[in-house]
Amino acid sequence: MATAVRSGRLSSWQSFCQWVTDTNNRIYIGWFGVLMIPCLLAATTCFIVAFIAAPPVDIDGIREPVAGSLLYGNNIISGAVVPSSNAIGLHFYPIWDAASLDEWLYNGGTYQLVVFHFLIGISAYMGRQWELSYRLGMRPWICVAYSAPLSAAMAVFLVYPFGQGSFSDGMPLGISGTFNFMLVFQAEHNILMHPFHMLGVAGVFGGSLFSAMHGSLVTSSLVRETTENESHNYGYKFGQEEETYNIVAAHGYFGRLIFQYASFNNSRSLHFLLGAWPVVGIWFTSMGVSTMAFNLNGFNFNQSILDSQGRVLNTWADMVNRAGLGMEVMHERNAHNFPLDLATVESTPVALQAPAIG
C-alpha cells in the first residue's frame, strides 16, 4: 500500500473507490448508488416483463386467479402487477421457496420481487442524495424533502400489508389497480374522515397553489435585460450574481393584493415554506395510512342526525357511509367475505329512506 502511494499508482480497489465517490462524474454514483442501481434495474426489468406477460395471480387465495398483464387481455389502463396471494400472507416468497417457477408466478411472487427491490432502490436514492450533498458541502434538506414520497411508498407497499396481515392487501402496480386500492381503502378505513389525510390534501393542494403563485410572481417581476423583441429568458446568464427578478416589486404587489404580512420579504424563508409545506403534508398522509393499516380508522359517523320526528337529516357523512358500504360489497366479491357491518344482527343506521309512492 505504502509503495503504491509513494509511486503514485493506485490499486484497482482504490481506483474504483475514487471513481464511485468522484463528484466530477457526469452522473454521481456514490456508495448508495452501488446499491441503488442494481436494485432499481432489477425492479424495473421485472415490472416491465410482468406487466407484459405475467400469468394470472391467485390474489385472494381461493383458486380464482386475476389476470393483470397485457398478454392476458389487459390494456395500459387496466394492466397491473397483481399483489402476491393471500395464501402467502406476509411470508417472504423468493423464487427458491416455490416448488416451481409456475407456482411462484401463480402465487404472485413477481410482486414481492418488484416491491422489495423498488423500496431498497428508492431508499438508497435518498441516501445518495445525502451523500452527494455532503461531498459538495451542501445542506441536507434535499434528501429530507425526498423522504416524503419515500414514506408514502413505504406506507402503501410495506406498512399497510404488514398491518393487514398479507401482501395481497398491498397496492397493485398499475393505474386501475391504484384506483381500486384507493376505493377499497376508503371503504374499509374511511380515510376521507381521517385528519392526517386532510392535512395531506392541504399539503399537496396548498403546495401546488404556493408553487403556482411563486412562479407567476417571479415571472411577472423579472428584471428586463433584453429588448422588446426578445424573450425575457435570454436576459438570464447562468451563474449571474445579481437577482433575476425584483423581489421588492413582487412583495409590494402581493402585499397589496391580500395584506402586507401575507407577503414574504425574505427569499430564504419563502423557499423554506415552499419546500416544507407539501413535505409535512405528505408525511402526515403517510402516518395516516400507517395508522389505518392497523385499523385505527378515520372518524366514524354511523349515527345519522334525526329531526324531532325521527326523520333522517342527510349529511355528507351519510353519503360517505353509503358509498363505503357499496364499495365494500363489491370488493373481493368472489371471496364471499360479506362486510361485517352489513352481516351483523342489528342493522347499521345509515341515511336510507324509502320515497313515498302515490
Swiss-Prot record:
[CaMn4O5] cluster binds at D169, E188, H331, E332, D341, A343. It is found in: Cellular thylakoid membrane. GO terms for biological process: photosynthetic electron transport in photosystem II; response to herbicide. The record marks A343, T344 as: Cleavage. The chain crosses the membrane at residues 28-45, 117-132, 141-155, 196-217, 273-287. One of its GO terms (molecular function) is oxidoreductase activity, acting on diphenols and related substances as donors, oxygen as acceptor. The D1/D2 heterodimer binds P680, chlorophylls that are the primary electron donor of PSII, and subsequent electron acceptors. It shares a non-heme iron and each subunit binds pheophytin, quinone, additional chlorophylls, carotenoids and lipids. D1 provides most of the ligands for the Mn4-Ca-O5 cluster of the oxygen-evolving complex (OEC). There is also a Cl(-1) ion associated with D1 and D2, which is required for oxygen evolution. The PSII complex binds additional chlorophylls, carotenoids and specific lipids. Pheophytin a binds at Y125. The record marks Y160 as: Tyrosine radical intermediate. Residues 344-358 form a propeptide. Chlorophyll a ChlzD1 binds at H117. One of its GO terms (cellular component) is photosystem II. It comes from the Bacteria. Fe cation binds at H214, H271. It holds the Pfam family Photo_RC. It catalyses: 2 a plastoquinone + 4 hnu + 2 H2O = 2 a plastoquinol + O2. Belongs to the reaction center PufL/M/PsbA/D family. NCBIfam families: psbA. This is Photosystem II protein D1 3. The lineage of its organism: Bacteria, Bacillati, Cyanobacteriota, Cyanophyceae, Synechococcales. The gene is psbA3.
